């Protein structure tokens, strides 16, 4: 049994449901199988490695309804976003309760098994409204929810095969491993940072403000499915490595991927992101403006307000920062809390504007993005376009 270092896992125990034995794999090949998508595979992996502790499988009806309606599991543990396995009615009809099934990817690989304990039909309109705060199909998370299978299967899983993370493999670690790493580094307070975007000056500023108060920064970028106009994960990873190389102390930061899909659930997803980082061993977590948001579906500081209301229950400390910008008169990064000057002296660009500049090959102002980082992003996006044109 491996030692679990650091902060207590969410719900009290760090889950590990991995079984990579040949005997288990061979037994799984004899089971009835269900083909699941990449989103489901990433959820399966996070349940299996303990990132989603205390979950031990895809949610059964009692947990699902409790989470949708009360933001807590049936056990009373806070949990904000349903982790479900949706299937078609036709597939559901073929699967009997209390049977074990193999979970396959489109590649034919058996990634895990599941003991089917429950089959139920969710109220997707209610789930959308309570989790995403909208039933609008233009919302990417809601769109995916509606496109998902109409029947949910619930039950305990085993992880038999981890997905190949390709170029990111050197930056992949499980919660047990990150906790040991923090222990070996002597870090007692670790602040986690979630991102699906490149790190620009505003992100750098709030990360370093937090880093002044803790032992180490756990930079944990999401590399699973995102929406089409987000910057691709492989391009972002190059930008992370570049900014860490030139602008961060090497002994105070660790870069590890978060192999999850992006739900764009705003405030509710901010809580999920914090739970996962707690399981990875973080004692602290940064909640920025419009955390996990998309479009205008959520208020600028709505995620911060929700997470403040559950801070004691979460058992973590949260860093919450105002919108930051570069002030020409101050000659530095600042927020409204620290800068007395007007908007005419502030340099700040939206993520959409910065993405367009980068796509057009334009280096944003150095007050917005580090030139080294911008160049890596421009080159990476250009390379992606060329690859797409070749196909």
UniProtKB/Swiss-Prot annotation:
- Catalytic activity, EC: 2.7.7.4
What Gene3D superfamilies does this protein's entry cite?
HUPs, Sulfate adenylyltransferase
Question: Keyword Transferase on this protein?
Answer: yes
Please provide the record's keywords in A-Z order. Answer: ATP-binding, Nucleotide-binding, Nucleotidyltransferase, Transferase
Q: Which terms in the Gene Ontology molecular function aspect does this entry carry?
A: ATP binding; sulfate adenylyltransferase (ATP) activity
The protein's matches in InterPro entries, at most eight in alphabetical order, are given as: ATP-Sase_PUA-like_dom (IPR025980), PUA-like_sf (IPR015947), Rossmann-like_a/b/a_fold (IPR014729), SO4_adenylyltransferase_pro (IPR020792), Sulfurylase_cat_dom (IPR024951), Sulphate_adenylyltransferase (IPR002650)
Reply yes or no: does the keyword ATP-binding apply. Answer: yes
Q: Which reaction does it catalyse?
A: sulfate + ATP + H(+) = adenosine 5'-phosphosulfate + diphosphate
Q: Could you say which enzyme class this protein belongs to?
A: transferase
Question: What pathway does the UniProt record associate with this protein?
Answer: Sulfur metabolism; hydrogen sulfide biosynthesis; sulfite from sulfate: step 1/3
Share an example GO biological-process annotation for this protein: sulfate assimilation
Q: Which family does it belong to?
A: Belongs to the sulfate adenylyltransferase family.
Full protein name: Sulfate adenylyltransferase
The UniProt gene name for this protein comes to: sat
